[in-house]
């Protein structure tokens, strides 16, 4: 939810799970990936929210931008170890997680916000396919789903439109 609707515990948990978890996972995986290199690949989960800061999801977007930046940096940093680092960037994945509330002080499901915005849900199977393609492909970031692709185009070619749409 919006930054000011999150209490400190919720904000800390979001950062801990979405960014610190990725950092800790990367650090733990590195020795194993290095031992099986070349051909090793660390796959991170960023988000379409890492393409353009999403109003109402400011802290979530910030953590996913951090994952995107970490992915790019580690891909170069670990090149000498024979480890490739990439990410998938899904938009809204059609899971039970979207049935949950926006935050602790709301009972409004996240799904309602996505539907109201006219955005599409991506089936879980498409995310699995994209993960396979990411690990076996050459792109550093793999967009997943129609909403992610639309967001990438709009963020690149129409950032003013993105700001107006968010209001």
How would you name each of these model-derived features?
Residues 28-39:
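A short helix-coil junction within the Rossmann-fold of NAD(P)-dependent oxidoreductases
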Residues 2-3, 7-15:
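Substrate-binding pocket helix/loop in short-chain dehydrogenase/reductase
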Residues 26, 63:
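Active-site helix of classical SDR
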Residues 47:
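Residue(s) in the substrate-gating loop at a strand-loop-helix junction
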Residues 80-146:
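SDR active-site lid
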Residues 3-4, 54-58:
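Active-site loop immediately N-terminal to the catalytic Tyr-X3-Lys motif
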Residues 52, 73-84:
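Active-site-adjacent segment of SDR/Rossmann-fold oxidoreductases
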């Amino acid at each position: 939810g919006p930054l000011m609707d999150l209490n400190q515990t919720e904000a800390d948990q979001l950062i801990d799970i979405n960014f610190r978890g990725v950092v800790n996972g990367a650090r733990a995986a590195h020795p194993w990936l290095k031992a099986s290199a070349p051909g090793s690949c660390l796959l991170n989960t960023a988000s379409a929210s890492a393409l353009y800061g999403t109003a109402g999801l400011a802290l979530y977007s910030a953590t996913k931008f951090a994952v995107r930046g970490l992915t790019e940096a580690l891909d170069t940093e670990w090149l000498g170890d024979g480890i490739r680092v990439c990410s998938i960037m899904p938009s809204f994945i059609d899971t039970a997680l979207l049935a949950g509330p926006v935050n602790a002080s709301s009972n409004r499901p996240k799904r309602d916000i996505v539907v109201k915005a006219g955005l599409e849900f991506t089936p879980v199977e498409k995310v699995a396919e994209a993960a396979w393609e990411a690990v076996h492909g050459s792109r550093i970031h793999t967009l997943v789903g129609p909403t992610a692709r639309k967001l990438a185009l709009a963020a690149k070619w129409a950032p003013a439109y993105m700001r107006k749409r968010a209001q």
